[in-house]
Amino acid sequence: MQSKLLLSTKLTSQGKTQLDQYFVSPPFKVMTLPAYDDAWQNGLNAMQMSSSPGLLASDLFDIEISLADDTALSLNTQAFTRVQSMNEGDYATQKTCIKLGKNSRLFYLPHPLVLHKDSSFKQTTEIEMSEQSELIYGEIVAIGRVLNGERFAFRHFASYLRISYQNRPIIADRIQWLPAKMALTSLSQMEDFSHQGSLTYVNLAKNAVEIKAMVSELQALAAEQKNMLIGVSQLNEGGLMVRVLAHRADIIQHLFERIGQVLKAQSNIV
């Protein structure tokens, strides 16, 4: 099955963000949500939904998101994405392409990805920033259905994230897991944890001193958390990354939502 989700935003004459172009093929659907108290005033809140029980062999999910100048979008998902069991040599794929217009802001936090036994999954995410644009993007992955006794029972997981500005890379993050060939429970890998999360923040309007202060604030927040291993690193330019290991998906999800609110509150864009 090949599925497509295409959405873009526009700015109304009242200065509010609305959906502009919108196209989905099954199992995708997008629902706009009521506005809530948020530091990004006049932004759009939306939920990405899916009626699929999960990705099967040869499935391709193609997601394209484009934000117009001066718009703000907070996009969440409805439920976990599950990669189902498949024959050896088969795999499912997801491709995500995001373009941010000048002065636009995006918060995108999909629900965790769950890798079932004998599954293989490849995903690529490419994000193009523009002048004064701001990005908060999170990914969470589970090593299997742990409560069913599945730990690293999948065959292959590959994830590539590339964020660029004017065709110049700001960050490239690649994850490659082959449980049959890699000691993924060793020190400096997953150890005894079952869930990994990554949250990337990019705001090229912030200087190194401002980003460093934000890193310090998030490190203090991380120190308060229990049953998680958290690292916060400053990027070479205009941003930071948070990496988390935990035993449950929901605590990473809640932490990233809280961090998102902290970062939104320090937005330089009114």
UniProtKB/Swiss-Prot annotation:
Entry keyword Nucleotide-binding: no
Keyword list, A-Z: Chaperone, Cytoplasm, Nickel insertion
GO molecular function, one term: nickel cation binding
GO cellular component: cytoplasm
Localisation per UniProt entry: Cytoplasm
Superkingdom assignment: Bacteria
One matching Pfam family: UreD
InterPro entries: UreD
Family that this chain belongs to: Belongs to the UreD family.
Protein function: Required for maturation of urease via the functional incorporation of the urease nickel metallocenter.
Subunit structure and binding partners: UreD, UreF and UreG form a complex that acts as a GTP-hydrolysis-dependent molecular chaperone, activating the urease apoprotein by helping to assemble the nickel containing metallocenter of UreC. The UreE protein probably delivers the nickel.
PANTHER family: UREASE ACCESSORY PROTEIN D
Designated name of the protein: Urease accessory protein UreD
Organism: Actinobacillus pleuropneumoniae serotype 3 (strain JL03)
Species lineage: Bacteria, Pseudomonadati, Pseudomonadota, Gammaproteobacteria, Pasteurellales
